Amino acid sequence: MSKVYFTQDHEWLNIEGEIATVGITHYAQEQLGDLVFVDLPQCGTQLSQGDSAAVVESVKAASDVYSPIDGEVVEINEALADDPALVNKKAEKEGWLWKMKLHDKTQLDGLMDEDAYKVLIG
């Protein structure tokens, strides 16, 4: 069974076992506008919580996407190279950015559930 967490920087994580799928929230993509380019981390990259892991560029601005937890990148969403707008269309489904192997599950305790995130974005 998977569980979804959210960060104050508007990333989401879907946890399945030891693997976290990471992306930006629907709210974040709405604020950015139409995405035109996504720069993703390489597989094998070790990330620490808070590291700048990816960049999403829209017609408005370029924004860093931060690693919500410590872990190793094990897969990236190759489809975004040809169609970065997938993030706009389905930010919390097919528009995921990367998958990572968790190093410390206790870090999840500092993240928000969906209800807390909805309060954050008002």
UniProtKB/Swiss-Prot annotation:
Q: Which domain of life is it from?
A: Bacteria
Q: What does the record say about how the cofactor binds?
A: Binds 1 lipoyl cofactor covalently.
Extract the CDD domains matched here: GCS_H
The cofactor required is: (R)-lipoate
Question: What is one term from the GO cellular component aspect held by the record?
Answer: cytosol
Residue ranges annotated for the Lipoyl-binding domain, each copy included: 19-101
Work out whether the entry's keyword set contains Transmembrane.
no
Please give the InterPro entries that the UniProt record associates with this protein. Answer: 2-oxoA_DH_lipoyl-BS (IPR003016), Biotin_lipoyl (IPR000089), GCV_H (IPR002930), GCV_H/Fam206 (IPR033753), GCV_H_sub (IPR017453), Single_hybrid_motif (IPR011053)
Q: Function of this protein?
A: The glycine cleavage system catalyzes the degradation of glycine. The H protein shuttles the methylamine group of glycine from the P protein to the T protein.
Entry protein name: Glycine cleavage system H protein
What species is given as this protein's source? Bartonella bacilliformis (strain ATCC 35685 / KC583 / Herrer 020/F12,63)
The gene coding this protein = gcvH
